[in-house]
Swiss-Prot record:
Residues 1201-1210 have a biased composition (Basic residues). It comes from Arabidopsis thaliana. Pathway: tRNA modification; 5-methoxycarbonylmethyl-2-thiouridine-tRNA biosynthesis. Residues 1188-1197 have a biased composition (Low complexity). This is Elongator complex protein 1. It is found in: Cytoplasm; Nucleus. Homodimer. Component of the elongator complex which consists of ELP1/ELO2, ELP2, ELP3/ELO3, ELP4/ELO1, ELP5, and ELP6. It holds the Pfam family HB_ELP1. Keywords: Abscisic acid signaling pathway, Auxin signaling pathway, Cytoplasm, Nucleus, Repeat, tRNA processing, WD repeat. InterPro entries: A-sol_ELP1, Elp1, ELP1_b-prop_2, ELP1_N_b-prop_1, HB_ELP1, TPR_ELP1, WD40/YVTN_repeat-like_dom_sf.
């Protein structure tokens, strides 16, 4: 669905030597982009194609040409002409048989051969190694570029005595013979005469180029003009012939390499027998076929296009018959057509493909004098199918469509120079026009309109167009008869007036009048016109080079500014469209341009470098574009938010729009992978349709619904509270229904639940919605890769926790159903669904509703209205069973203690009666409390079971106790329900026994005390090591003095064995009166001050001496340990600094070699291992394993883990984690808080005993150790984050001095006695 548009036309004139001289042949130099023309006067003219681009718009002047004369005999003339790129020379054949090579640069002509009968056709092989030549005698010669003849063949098949063309019959225009090569040069086709049935006919022959073998030939036909054109891709050979016994116009037929005809089409209307085809040319892309058709009063250049097994006439350009126009395609540019006339007027026309689908998704496909109209919003109907058609008086060249403000108009420029207009009815009535054909009259115009190149509606009564005047083909335009002296290109406004009243629901095809109201000469070519939707009666005009200017109706062109910067595309963009976007509440134009290299620019800035097509999508009805649709050459369809483009959030350049196949899952889901290679975006369906229309290379249409557009449409519908539209979108595109709730938060949805239910107005759909609810935010999970543009009030922007989403939403839906929807069976089933799908399911409430319906049925109520408004109980129950697990429903029915209901549930769930009837019958025979108890036990409702069994009576107390013992959480409730004091004591004792089993001895002891089980309480206290509790219970048990003393000795030993010598000392002193034993225990507990106090209390010298000797011994041992620890601190710090220095050097080396540190094996490291000591009782030794002890292997067996734990006290020298392990060990050597307290107690004890020297020595040694450890840790911490280790900066002595001077007053050194602190 595309049309071929002429977007640039540059005519120029060759200044010939005489008026009688005419241009006859042309050749193209691909390397230097030159055209060579040979005239009837044997002159050769050379033109540079770049001169066409440098000329001003529509300038008609003599071109600068290079002229050379071919020196041949009088009476001889040029009959064949071509350019040999390999020799950089022109190859010329004459009527007398001369074969000349003319070097263009040196202007030297060389005779290379003389052909008998004259040269009729010359055709070089596309691969540049062979040359085909046809003589005037009908002989085929194939030679090399060295002029060596490879073979000679006869083209015709004329028997003896048949007619043979004389050599003097050779002329320029005799035609009849040609050579056409396949694109790869392996085969070529010729057309030769055949004498058959007494008359001369022609047939196509296909030859193999290397051997000259005849591969195949066609049937004999009445081929005209000897036209033969092999498609460059090699698929088809085009030829022209007239059908036998048929007076209609000739047909263009297509043949395969095997000589069989594949298809054909007529070049004109069937009734027009005066038309004939003079020339055929394929473009380099093999998709366009251009031909010169000679009509009764004019010659026409026609361009055909093939799609969906149909040939479309896409362009027709008329010339006067006397002009003798000829065409050729630019070999390097598939859409550039070069035309020249006999008088030397050369025109270069640039075509472009434009989508036939307009902004409102209506397709207008041009086919000759018809326009095929299809509204794609009604049906995806690929051409040549259509809804209805419009017929015109001549071929259609260009169209412009207007669809705004309830007006739908079409302006059509015809090949005869006339304008036609059509006004359509409202689009919703177009279905009634199906199959109709409307004949459109030309408009009345009294002025010369010229040849339109661009056409655009400004408003419903005004057209803006670019028109060319002065070209030779203007003489064939109907408006060319009006006197005008205009030359060049003009920008002009055309006023359109309709003198007939438009009839609603009808197509208006006549009564229009056009007149030029404004006209201004253009100094440079206009390449595109685009309507400005943000400003009334205005447009944007693009000039050559990409400069974009603004135009207001009936005014001069004024420079357009966007953010105070001129809009100028980086390159010329033939495809220009303007989108109206919303920029913070202000509508602004977004000017998009696409050049022929695939560069897409927005407001002059490059957005994408590999774009193949683009379009706009609007989710609103106010023509504000919300998304930009980009299809790349990689066949990825991107959906870009226009707000991101305005804010600059979209990455510029083609990097953003190229997807790495290995990372596609990680990319933002804003693109769609198009499965058809080479497909193009031809249009979109705006609004809630949210569709992108693609046309594949095969011609069929595909409509896709990108998820991002669909979600955007849903968001927009929800923002406008259009719940039904949003629901239908979700349902149609299989979007998760939770989107409706999650987009703006489920709490916001609760406020709109009534509107949702009323708008959807379909209980089956509401049920479907309810069943889809789940406790998660799908915008953060399933659709987290899509960005949602939230609209509406701020209340809708609340995002909530999903913990109770389902229950809250379904409750709101249920309330809306009950209050705003009339009673009906469907409503009741929907309500049951909301209960069943709640989280957790409200099964009991659902069963109660069903139970009430069943009771109503059993009562045989006469309220028929009530019966009709509810489903039957069986239907409701089956619906509930369909939603939920039948076992859960059966258990819930049992939980209601309704055995009849449970039986009905079991029957409807298709359970075997043998499974449930005996059980239900057994329950029915039980007392009510016992039945409830049995049911509660089955359902594991133990609290209710306990209440029921207690209410069953005293006789069931053993069952009560069994239940409580099996479910210990019931003990508190049991104590509350059981009022008998004796039975309460039984419950308490059982509870305490349970606590003993749980190893909760202290709680068990307390519980035993509550039930007066003192002996068990004493054992419980003893188990938990609470000697005070044991002795308290012993007093309650009224034990004797000896028994208490014995118990105290036993407890003293047990407590000491548990590692609590201080508490054992307390028992020995207070209960056993063992002074010596108590002091020894205090010494073991390192409670030096308390031991000395007890010794002084009992004034025993021997005991004081024991304390003194123990204190001195401990002080001596600590001094030795602290000195050893100081040495280890120095050792670890030295090793750390060495390792750190080596690591830094290696890292620098690896960085220079661009290698990773992880891959390096430190071969220079030592293999020795350093073991940690236990250090002293006053230091904290870390037992964490270093990273160095962890193997780099991925295998992690349990045995290896255990082996690592055993080796966790070691540091492997040279391992990757040695640095941090050394730092961790230095930190682990710090003094603990308990050690500091015990050290201070020892110092005070020594001072009290008069051992000041020992105390001072101990304090100084301990201080030195602590200063060393703190300084070493600080030094290591500073070097970890440093990139170098400077020995002067990171000096241990400096850190130690700093620590000693600043840290003495800190809490860490509060254990020190001030009297011993050195200055």
């Amino acid at each position: 669905m595309k049309n071929l548009k002429l977007f640039s036309e540059v005519p120029q004139n060759i200044q010939l030597h005489s008026t009688e001289e005419v241009v006859q042949f042309a050749a193209y130099d691909i390397d230097q982009s030159r055209l060579f023309f040979a005239s009837s006067a044997n002159f050769v003219y050379a033109l540079q194609l770049s001169s066409f681009q440098n000329e001003s718009a529509g300038a008609k002047s003599a071109m600068p040409v290079e002229v050379c004369s071919i020196d041949i005999e009088p009476g001889d003339f040029i009959t064949a002409f071509d350019y040999l790129a390999e020799k950089e020379s022109l190859l010329i054949g004459t009527s007398h048989g001369l074969l000349l090579v003319h070097n263009v640069e040196s202007d030297v002509t060389e005779l290379v051969g003389n052909i008998e009968g004259g040269v009729k056709c010359i055709s070089p092989n596309p691969t540049g190694d062979l040359l085909g030549l046809i003589t005037g005698l009908g002989q085929l010669l194939v030679m090399t570029y060295d002029w060596a003849l490879m073979y000679e063949k006869a083209l015709g098949e004329v028997p003896e005595g048949g007619y043979v063309r004389e050599t003097n019959d050779l002329s320029v225009n005799c035609g009849g013979i040609s050579i056409s090569w396949r694109g790869d040069g392996k085969y070529f086709a010729t057309m030769g005469e055949v004498y058959e049935s007494g008359c001369m006919s022609k047939k196509i022959k296909i030859w193999e180029s290397d051997s000259g073998a005849l591969q195949s030939s066609s049937e004999t036909k009445e081929f005209t003009q000897g036209i033969l054109e092999w498609m460059p891709s090699g698929a088809k050979i085009a030829a022209v012939y007239k059908r036998k016994s048929d007076d209609s116009s000739p047909s263009i037929a297509f043949f395969e390499r095997n000589g069989l005809e594949r298809s054909s089409f007529r070049i004109g209307e069937p009734e027009d027998a005066t038309e004939s085809c003079e020339n055929l040319k394929w473009n380099s892309a093999s998709d366009l076929l251009a031909g010169v058709v000679s009509c009764k009063t004019y010659d026409a250049i026609r361009v055909w296009f093939f799609s969906n097994n149909h040939w479309y006439l896409k362009q027709e350009i008329r010339y006067p018959r006397e002009a003798g126009v000829t065409v050729m395609w630019d070999p390097t540019k598939p859409l550039q057509l070069i035309c020249w006339t006999l008088s030397g007027q050369v025109s270069v026309r640039h075509f472009m493909w434009v989508t036939a689908v307009m902004e409102d998704s209506t397709a207008f496909v041009i086919d000759n004098s018809k326009i095929l109209v299809t509204p794609l919003s009604l049906s995806l109907m690929p051409p040549p199918m259509y809804l209805f058609s419009l017929s015109f008086s001549s071929a259609v060249r260009d169209i412009a469509y207007y669809s705004r403000n309830s007006k739908n108009c079409l302006a059509v420029f015809l090949s005869d120079g006339n304008l036609s207009f059509v006004e359509f009815p409202a689009p919703n009535t177009w279905e009634d026009l199906e199959g109709k054909d409307f004949s459109v009259e030309i408009s009345d115009c009294k002025t010369a309109l010229g040849s339109f190149v661009h056409l655009l509606w400004l408003d419903v009564h005004s057209l803006l167009c670019v028109s060319a005047y002065g070209s030779s083909h203007n003489k064939c335009l109907s408006s060319g008869g009006y006197d005008t002296e205009l030359h060049g290109s003009y920008l002009q406004e055309v006023e359109v007036v309709c003198h007939e009243d438009h009839v609603p629901d009808q197509v208006t095809c006549s009564g229009f009048k056009a007149s030029i109201t404004f006209q201004t000469l253009l100094e440079s070519p206009v390449l595109a016109l685009a309507w400005n939707p943000s400003k009334r009666d205005s447009a944007f005009v693009e000039f050559e080079g990409g400069k974009v200017l603004g135009y207001a109706s009936r005014s001069e062109i004024m420079e357009t500014r966007s953010s105070d910067d001129s809009v100028c595309f980086p390159s010329t963009c033939p495809w220009v469209r303007v989108a109206q976007v919303d920029a913070s509440g202000v509508h602004k134009p977004l000017i998009c341009g696409l050049d022929d290299m695939g560069r897409l620019s927005i407001n002059g800035k490059n957005l994408c470098n590999n774009c193949s097509s683009f379009s706009f999508y609007s989710e609103l009805a106010n023509e504000v574009v919300t998304h930009l649709i980009i299809l790349t050459k990689q066949d990825f369809l991107f959906i870009v938010d226009t707000k991101d483009v305005l804010n600059g959030d979209v990455a510029l350049g083609n990097v953003f729009f190229v997807i790495d196949g290995r990372r596609r899952d990680e990319e933002n889901m804003s693109y769609v992978n198009i499965w058809e290679r080479g497909a193009k975006v031809i249009g979109v369906l705006n609004g809630d349709e949210a569709a992108v229309i693609l046309q594949t290379m095969r011609g069929n249409l595909e409509c896709i619904y990108p998820r991002k557009l669909v979600l955007s449409s849903i968001t927009n519908a929800l923002a406008q509270q259009r719940f039904k539209d949003a629901f239908n979108l979700v349902r149609r595109h299989r979007i998760d229904f939770n989107v409706i709730v999650d987009l703006y938060g489920w709490q916001a949805f609760l406020q709109s639940a009534v509107a949702f239910v009323e708008q959807v107005n379909n209980l089956n759909h509401v049920t479907e919605f309810v069943c889809a609810m789940k406790n998660e935010d799908v915008t953060e999970t399933l659709y987290k890769k899509f960005s949602f543009s939230k609209k509406g009030d701020e209340v809708f922007r609340v995002k909530d926790s999903c913990s109770n989403k389902v229950s809250s939403v379904l409750q709101a839906i249920r309330k809306a159903l009950e209050e705003h929807i009339p009673e009906s069976p469907s409503r009741e089933l929907c309500i049951l669904t909301t209960l069943a799908r709640s989280d957790p399911p409200a099964i009991e409430e659902s069963l109660l509703r069903i139970k009430s319906v069943r009771e109503m049925e059993l009562l045989n109520s006469s309220d028929d209205i009530r019966k009709k408004s509810c489903p039957s109980a069986e239907e409701a129950l089956k619906h509930l069973l369909w939603l939920l697990d039948s076992e859960a429903v059966f258990e819930a029915a049992l939980g209601l203690y309704d055995l009849n209901l449970a039986a009905i549930v079991a029957l409807n769930s298709q359970r075997d009666p043998k499974e449930f009837l005996p059980y239900l019958q057994e329950l029915e025979k039980m007392p009510e409390s016992l039945m409830h108890f049995k049911i509660d036990i089955k359902l594991q409702r133990f609290d209710s079971a306990l209440r029921n069994i207690v209410s069953a009576g005293v006789g069931y107390f053993p069952d009560c106790m069994n239940l409580i013992k099996k479910n210990p959480q019931l003990f508190p409730l049991g104590l509350l329900l059981i009022t008998d004091p004796e039975k309460k004591l039984v419950v308490l004792e059982a509870w305490a026994d349970h606590l003993i089993d749980e190893k909760r001895f202290e709680d068990a002891a307390t519980t035993y005390l509550c039930c007066c089980k003192l002996e068990k309480a004493s054992k419980a206290y003893r188990e938990c090591g609470d000697w005070s509790g044991v002795l308290r219970v012993g007093a309650l048990m009224k034990l004797g003095k000896d028994e208490i003393l014995k118990l105290a000795y036993e407890l003293c030993e047990e407590v000491n064995a548990l590692g609590k010598p201080a508490e054992a000392a307390k028992i020995a002193l207070e209960y056993c009166s063992d002074i010596s034993g108590g002091i020894s225990l205090l010494i073991n507990a390192r409670e030096w001050e308390e031991a000395l106090r007890v010794a002084f209390l009992h004034t025993a010298d021997d005991r004081i001496s024991v304390v003194k000797s123990s204190a001195l011994e401990c002080a001596s041992g600590l001094v030795s340990e602290f000195k050893e620890s100081i040495e280890k601190v120095g050792k670890y710090l030295t090793r750390y600094l060495a390792v750190r220095q080596r690591r830094l050097l290696l890292a620098a080396k690896l960085k220079s070699e661009e290698r990773s540190v992880v891959d390096l094996d430190d071969d220079t490291a030592s293999e020795a291992s350093s073991n940690l000591s236990g250090m002293s009782a006053y230091t904290l030794g870390t037992r964490r394993g270093s990273a160095a002890s962890v193997s780099s292997s991925n295998a992690t067996s349990r045995a290896r883990d255990l082996r690592r734990q055993r080796k966790s006290g070691k540091i492997r020298a040279g391992s990757a984690g040695e640095e941090m392990a050394l730092v961790d060990h230095l930190k682990g050597m710090r003094m603990t808080d308990g050690g500091k307290r015990e050290l201070k107690s020892l110092l005070i004890c020594l001072v009290t005993l008069g051992e000041m020297e020992s105390a001072q020595k101990l304090q100084q040694t301990a201080e030195n150790f602590q200063v060393s450890q703190v300084a070493a840790v600080e030094l290591a911490h500073d070097t970890v984050s440093s990139e170098s280790v400077d020995e002067e900066v990171y000096c241990f002595e400096r850190y130690a001095q700093k620590t000693r001077s600043t840290a003495r007053d800190s809490d860490a050194f509060s254990w020190m006695l001030k009297v011993f602190i050195s200055p």
